[in-house]
């Protein structure tokens, strides 16, 4: 049987792991290291270099070296080299091929299957791109797994019931997840993150600082010199790492550039305090996803049993201190290597899928709510955010107009109550509905999300059996900034959304009452006394006028509500008048017939029957 590996395809570094005798082992690469830089370069002779060798030659081959390609996954980014365009999938495939070769050399056999990890907040197009990269590299991608989930799997497989917080700050992405572990089940309770926050951003702040200092001292802008910038990036990364263990570092780059006077050298000192000051706002950005996860999971900080730090960037003292502060003074677990834990978890999941690891269940979640637009522009959620996947949910909807021939199903993703403020994922139409009064047809809308997060939507007319399907290949296809916007707006405009929802619901109730009352008047024309009919019709006209007054977004909700209540109150007179007539008719019939105890009893029985009919009628109309 072909071996399956677990791959952590990182922004700055990648790791591959395999199960040996049921235990995960991190594979050493051809250069003897356990991590491989996620760098691809094209040598002048056309040879493709990957990993450490690509990183080493980057300074002298800037234009033909690609790094941090993970940040471009799922986009239309391209690089043209030697007259050929390369996309992110192809670049990532070069890295995956290198990891595959190293694994095959280590194991002495072919490797065809892999579980590849992605940030928890990766959208569907980014996940699809990662899967495609694996396929281009010649791998059968068994599953795309979220990085924090894989980390928890590696950490907690042998643990009793525990609640674990995974704080994952890598080279280019940031995720926080809260998971519950016990009896071989790893269940994600909530997840949040930022797809554009990572160690690269900390490096960039140091680069910007060095450029600024050099310009102030020498009047030369290094930002315009690609080769100098590459040297600065490498020096910045080295300085960042050194400042994790010491309080001061020297950045010395001789012959960084030249001016009319001759060669210029860069020599700067950077203290840990300066570094933390330069990057304070980046650290601040880590707080919101953390608070969102705690809020979404609905737990207290005291309920967190362990904190697991993942990603090389968590080695920065300021990050470790922030996590301790956020978790109420809890020390992070030191028993896991932040660089390797994700790949180990991926190898375990590969073992689960191949049947090598028994009695383990991994339950992941969808990061945002999914639903459809219903009357009044309301977002009706079928699947709430942080719902365990795979999942299937369905709900019965009906038509809003008489003899409606079709219904349009518009699928949205987000947290706002008004559909238009959420992300539209797709739309399709269910046609061929038979003519029927509004509210009669029954249309079942079903959402089905598979284990890879790809969503399928089905609409079925239960009357005719007609069905329409759509696959939303963007089950989570939202850029992180858009997710942030939705979340922030959901909080800022909660009151406004509530008002609009209330207005739409009040309007819907009013329209429904007009429809029902007019239908009742028409069906019982000969039984309703003239003066009662006139009064009811007048109140209906008032309600119609109120409904026409403004749109659902207007501020005449109170007016509509008052008119609706008036119609409801006046409508009661219809029933009273009809039953009064019925009783009078019964009484008259009893008097004309042979008067007797039996007839009187029968008349009483008829009255009782009328009450039961009334109950049924009310239930039917509800």
UniProtKB/Swiss-Prot annotation:
Keyword Lipid biosynthesis belongs to the record: no
Start and end residues of each stretch annotated as Disordered: 465-484, 491-511, 589-622
Alphabetical list of Gene3D superfamilies matching this protein: 1.20.1270.10, 3.30.30.30, 3.30.420.40, Actin, Chain A, domain 4, Substrate Binding Domain Of DNAk, Chain A, domain 1
Pfam family membership, one: HSP70
Alphabetic keyword roster: ATP-binding, Chaperone, Nucleotide-binding, Phosphoprotein, Stress response
Biased composition (Basic and acidic residues): 491-505
Gene Ontology terms, MF aspect: ATP binding; ATP-dependent protein folding chaperone; unfolded protein binding
Modified residues (Phosphothreonine): 173
InterPro entries: ATPase_NBD, Chaperone_DnaK, Heat_shock_70_CS, HSP70_C_sf, HSP70_peptide-bd_sf, Hsp_70_fam
Record-stated family: Belongs to the heat shock protein 70 family.
PANTHER family reported for this sequence: HEAT SHOCK PROTEIN 70KDA
NCBIfam families: PRK00290.1, prok_dnaK
Role played: Acts as a chaperone.
Protein name from the UniProt record: Chaperone protein dnaK1
Gene that this sequence comes from: dnaK1
């Amino acid at each position: 049987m072909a071996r399956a590996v677990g791959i952590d395809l990182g922004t700055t570094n990648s790791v591959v792991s395999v199960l040996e005798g049921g235990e995960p082992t991190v594979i050493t690469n051809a250069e003897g290291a356990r991590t491989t830089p996620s760098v691809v370069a094209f040598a002048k002779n056309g040879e493709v270099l990957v990993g450490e060798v690509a990183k080493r030659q980057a300074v002298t081959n800037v234009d033909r070296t690609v790094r941090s390609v993970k940040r471009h996954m799922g986009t239309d980014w391209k690089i043209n080299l030697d007259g050929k365009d390369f996309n992110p999938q192809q670049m990532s495939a070069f890295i995956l091929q290198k990891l595959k070769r190293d694994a095959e050399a280590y194991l002495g056999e072919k490797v065809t299957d892999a579980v590849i990890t992605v940030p928890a907040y990766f959208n569907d197009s980014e996940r699809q791109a990662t899967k495609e990269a694996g396929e281009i590299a010649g791998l059968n991608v068994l599953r795309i797994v979220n990085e924090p989930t894989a980390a928890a799997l590696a950490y907690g497989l042998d643990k009793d019931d525990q609640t674990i917080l995974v704080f994952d700050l890598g080279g280019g992405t940031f995720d926080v997840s809260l998971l519950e572990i016990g009896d071989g089940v790893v269940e994600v309770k909530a997840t949040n993150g930022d797809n554009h926050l990572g160690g690269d951003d900390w490096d960039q702040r140091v680069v910007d600082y060095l450029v600024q200092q050099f310009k102030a001292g020498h009047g030369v802008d290094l930002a315009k010199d690609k080769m100098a910038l590459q040297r600065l990036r490498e020096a910045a990364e080295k300085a960042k790492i050194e400042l994790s263990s010491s309080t001061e570092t020297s950045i010395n780059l001789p012959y960084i550039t030249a001016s009319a006077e001759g060669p210029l050298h860069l020599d700067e000192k950077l203290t840990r305090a300066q570094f933390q000051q330069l990057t304070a706002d980046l650290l601040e950005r880590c707080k919101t996803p953390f608070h969102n996860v705690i809020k979404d999971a609905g737990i207290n900080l005291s309920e967190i049993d362990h904190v697991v730090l993942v990603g090389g960037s968590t080695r920065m003292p300021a990050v470790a201190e922030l996590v301790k502060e956020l978790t109420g003074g809890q020390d992070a677990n030191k028993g896991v290597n932040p660089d390797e834990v994700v790949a180990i978890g991926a190898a375990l999941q590969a073992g689960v899928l191949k049947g090598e690891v028994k009695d383990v269940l991994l339950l992941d979640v969808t990061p945002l709510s999914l639903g459809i637009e219903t009357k009044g522009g309301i977002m009706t959620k079928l699947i709430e955010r942080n719902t365990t996947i795979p999942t299937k949910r369905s709900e019965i909807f009906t038509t809003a107009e008489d003899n409606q021939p079709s219904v349009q199903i518009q699928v949205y993703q987000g947290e706002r109550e008004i559909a238009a403020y959420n992300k539209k994922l797709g739309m399709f139409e269910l046609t061929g509905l038979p003519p029927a009064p509004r509210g009669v047809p029954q249309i079942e809308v079903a959402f089905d999300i598979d284990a890879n997060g790809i969503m399928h939507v089905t609409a079925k007319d239960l009357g005719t059996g007609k069905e329409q399907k759509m696959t939303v290949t963007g089950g989570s296809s939202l850029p992180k900034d858009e997710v942030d916007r939705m979340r922030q707006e959901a909080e800022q405009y909660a009151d406004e959304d509530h008002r609009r929802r209330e207005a739409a619901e009040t309007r819907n109730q009013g329209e429904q009452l007009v429809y029902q009352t007019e239908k009742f008047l028409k069906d019982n024309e000969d039984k309703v006394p003239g003066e009662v009919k006139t009064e009811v019709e007048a109140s209906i006209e008032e309600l119609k006028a109120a409904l026409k007054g403004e749109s659902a977004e207007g501020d005449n909700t109170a007016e509509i509500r008052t008119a609706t209540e008036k119609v409801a109150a006046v409508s009661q007179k219809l029933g009273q008048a009809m039953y009064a007539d019925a009783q009078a008719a019964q009484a008259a019939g009893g008097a004309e017939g042979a008067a007797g105890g039996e007839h009187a009893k029968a008349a009483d029985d008829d009255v009782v029957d009328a009450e039961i009919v009334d109950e049924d009628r009310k239930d039917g109309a509800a």
